[in-house]
A protein has these predicted regions:
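Signature of short aromatic-glycine-proline-rich micro-motifs recurring in repeat-based ectodomains
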Residues: 68, 196, 243-252
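Surface loop/turn motifs at the tips and blade-to-blade linkers of beta-strand repeat domains
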Residues: 59-64, 104-108, 143-148, 185-191, ...
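C-terminal motif of bacterial Sec signal peptides marking the signal peptidase cleavage site
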Residues: 31-32
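Short coil/turn segments that connect the beta-strands within blades of beta-propeller domains
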Residues: 75-76, 119-120, 158-159, 203-204, ...
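Conserved beta-strand positions in repeat-built beta-propeller and related beta-rich domains
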Residues: 80-84, 122-129, 161-167, 208-212, ...
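Beta-strand-rich domains and repeat architectures in extracellular enzymes and scaffolds
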Residues: 57-89, 105-116
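A short helix->beta-strand "capping" segment at the edge of beta-propeller domains
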Residues: 45-64, 95-98
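Conserved beta-strand position repeated across blades of beta-propeller domains
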Residues: 72, 114-116, 155, 200, ...
């Protein structure tokens, strides 16, 4: 409780504290991507993840006051959930202009996290309040549900919800009760991947930001194995980076148009990218 109170009093400590993790997390990912697996007869074959390249297809403006925690594109609407104490909102964003229509503002005591749309409901996590807010598609509050631990990223396969909490695990959640139905432990080349953050379901796989890095990993939800990854280092150019610009975070998939969008916390741009081997 004391640590949470400090975070509430000093919101800037959140970014500073988490940034200290970046070198450690990036080092783990580099080792996972480059090291050779140990060979032993009793060890199952380790999947070699595919390193995908990307190209930028289009660039759109993004509100530099939006600390992006969740992003989703559904039926022509770009949904965004943002964080920071006293600034967390759920909003709809006009893709072309970047203008946001705020639908609801969270209490000052809540730090907004991942969002997802499932059917006629929108779900929005909170970081340390152990609470998910449920809204209708107009942003009207319907109910809250409780969960154990922190909330980070959220996505859906069309039936169930999947939630990350900043660890190596992704939990399958019942959308009606928000009770845990299963757990996926994420591994890359046999090594656990920590700090799983924002999530997006794309063609039967879970795409995830790895917090404090420029990596997006592609996870098999049946096994937890990382089958591929994209390194977005350099996506946001140096001239677009300010003192407030934070890490890559936010993946949205336009299923009908086959488009993938990525952005970051307090970034001035949102990118449509094409992924290639």
């Amino acid at each position: 409780m004391f640590a949470e109170f400090l975070l509430y009093l000093f919101p800037n400590i959140v970014t500073s504290m988490k940034r200290l993790l970046s070198i450690m997390v990036l080092s783990v990912l580099v080792v996972a991507c480059s090291s050779q697996p140990k060979r032993a007869a009793s060890v199952p074959q380790i999947v070699e993840p595919i390193k995908y390249a990307y190209s930028v297809k289009a660039i759109y403006p993004h509100d530099t006051t939006s600390y992006t925690q969740g992003l989703q594109y559904v039926d022509g609407v770009l949904w965004e959930g943002t964080g920071e104490w006293g600034k967390s909102v759920l909003q709809k964003v006009d893709l072309q202009s970047g203008r946001a229509e705020v639908l609801t503002t969270l209490p000052r005591s809540e730090f907004g996290e991942g969002i997802t749309v499932l059917g006629d409901k929108v779900y929005q996590l909170t970081w340390t309040n152990n609470k998910v807010h449920v809204y209708d598609l107009q942003g009207r509050h319907l109910k809250d549900m409780r969960y154990v631990g922190e909330g980070w990223g959220l996505t859906s396969d069309g039936e169930s919800l999947y939630m990350s909490n900043g660890t190596t695990d992704i939990y399958k959640m019942d959308p009606e009760t928000f009770k845990r139905e299963g757990k996926i432990t994420v591994t890359m080349r046999g090594e656990a991947v920590n700090f799983i953050n924002e999530l997006e379901w794309i063609d039967g796989r879970i795409w995830a930001n790895v917090y404090t890095t420029d990596y997006v990993i592609i996870i098999n939800p049946q096994t937890g194995v990382v089958e591929g990854y994209i390194d977005f280092t350099g996506l946001l150019k140096d001239e677009d980076v300010t003192e407030r610009t934070d890490v890559l975070n936010g993946i949205a998939y336009d299923k009908d148009g086959g488009r993938i969008f990525v952005t970051g916390k307090l970034w001035n741009k949102l990118f449509e990218v094409e992924i290639n081997k």
